[in-house]
Structure formats: C-alpha cells, structure tokens
C-alpha cells in the first residue's frame, strides 16, 4: 500500500483495456507489406479448414468451427452458427467479433447469408441473425 506522498509523486497507472477481438483491430497494407491500425466491425477471410469441436464441461455437442485466414494475414478460429452449413475449404467468409463461451480459443462468429456462406433455410424466427430470407406467404 503506497503512502500519500508516494501517490503525490507518482500517480496510479490506468489499466489498459484489452480487445476481445484483436484480429479486427489490425489492417494490412499489401503495397508496403506492413500491418496498420485499421479497426473494422467485420473482416473477410478464406476458410483453411472446417471441422467439429467438442465443448468444455459440462456441455456435450459437436460444434462447427472454421479456421479462417483473414485479409490482414491473421488466422483465427470462427464459429459457424445455425443448423447446417455449406462451408468448405477455400470458401470466402465474413467474420464478426463475439466469442463462444464453451469453446476455448473461438473468439469470432461467421456471418451467415453473405459472400460464400448460405443462410439457414427453414428459419422462421431471428432470421436476420442467420441470413434467412422472409418466407413466402401461403395462398388462402
């Protein structure tokens, strides 16, 4: 515990807030081959592998995860939300930040319904989160 005199001489240092999605904070200048500080809400990338991962205790499932190499050169693991997907190696995807609580090391989500990722079909509720189109009205 510092004395008042020590605090007067040298004040406390504020804690630096760490980003939850650090790969979205970096850009890449391909002309100069340099990493830049260009923050973005989403980033495009190419799938290097698509696999299933088992979650931490106490949950049990086979969660769908893709390894994605982003346009800034960083490779990350991203979760594929929804039931069923059409992703495979070399698919071009858009990722956003947001971790999956029971999958260690997965800090990003893949956006459904954009680029090579198809939306979830037969989805009626929360359609915008899964890239599903509005269903056609049935004839009366």
UniProtKB/Swiss-Prot annotation:
Basic residues compositional bias, start-end: 124-140
Annotated stretches, region: Disordered: 1-28, 119-140
Highest taxon of source: Bacteria
GO molecular function ontology, one term from the record: structural constituent of ribosome
Keyword field: Methylation, Ribonucleoprotein, Ribosomal protein, RNA-binding, rRNA-binding, tRNA-binding
Listed GO biological process terms: translation
Gene3D superfamilies the record matches: Nucleic acid-binding proteins (2.40.50.140)
UniProt modified residues of type 3-methylthioaspartic acid: 102
GO CC annotation terms, alphabetical: small ribosomal subunit
Subunit structure: Part of the 30S ribosomal subunit. Contacts proteins S8 and S17. May interact with IF1 in the 30S initiation complex.
PANTHER family assigned: 30S RIBOSOMAL PROTEIN S12 FAMILY MEMBER
Family designation: Belongs to the universal ribosomal protein uS12 family.
Chain's role: With S4 and S5 plays an important role in translational accuracy.
Name the UniProt record assigns to this protein: Small ribosomal subunit protein uS12
Species of origin: Clostridioides difficile (strain 630)
Upper lineage: Bacteria, Bacillati, Bacillota, Clostridia, Peptostreptococcales
GN (gene name): rpsL
